[in-house]
């Protein structure tokens, strides 16, 4: 069975967020077109994503030195186990849908925390004599992003770092197909805000039927 991770990185719902509105439209359309696929929603604002901190490094260090899992402190066990769950889930999935806003030219910190959690050697990529090689070569991804300004073209295009980072890291993981659906300009052109949102929702619904 095809497994899809629907990963949302916005604290607001579709009534407030353009990216979440488009994401909801996409995933509902996708489910209707693919009723036999398993869709798992990962709300990054409502799930435990451990930061890679000293306790995590200490826990990993104990395991690498040959100590058993029981040698880790309770907090180390919780964090290390959760990171293993997240990275295993990511590696086992077939498709990834990232729904994010553009904040300060990038994305919310919870998105980077999630990427750090799943970017595990031996699962997402491996090291070879020639360098790192991605392992997720049979996957597919979609990036749904909303931007208040226009960053797809023009003088601000080089300032967009969120989707560019996700494109790069997913490519590093070996993902061969990464598509984008962008909703932009609603703050720059407030008189067209509703039209921009509605267009994004329509495009998302259409893409859900073919992705």
Curated annotation (Swiss-Prot):
Residues annotated to bind FMN: 17-19, 102-105, 146-149
GO molecular function, one term: oxidoreductase activity, acting on NAD(P)H, quinone or similar compound as acceptor
Annotated EC: 1.6.5.-, 1.7.1.17
Highest taxon of the lineage: Bacteria
Catalysed reactions listed for this entry: 2 a quinone + NADH + H(+) = 2 a 1,4-benzosemiquinone + NAD(+); N,N-dimethyl-1,4-phenylenediamine + anthranilate + 2 NAD(+) = 2-(4-dimethylaminophenyl)diazenylbenzoate + 2 NADH + 2 H(+)
Subunit composition and interactions: Homodimer.
Function as written in the Swiss-Prot or TrEMBL entry: Quinone reductase that provides resistance to thiol-specific stress caused by electrophilic quinones. Also exhibits azoreductase activity. Catalyzes the reductive cleavage of the azo bond in aromatic azo compounds to the corresponding amines.
Stated name of the protein: FMN-dependent NADH:quinone oxidoreductase
Species annotation: Macrococcus caseolyticus (strain JCSC5402) (Macrococcoides caseolyticum)
Species lineage: Bacteria, Bacillati, Bacillota, Bacilli, Bacillales
Gene symbol of the encoding locus: azoR
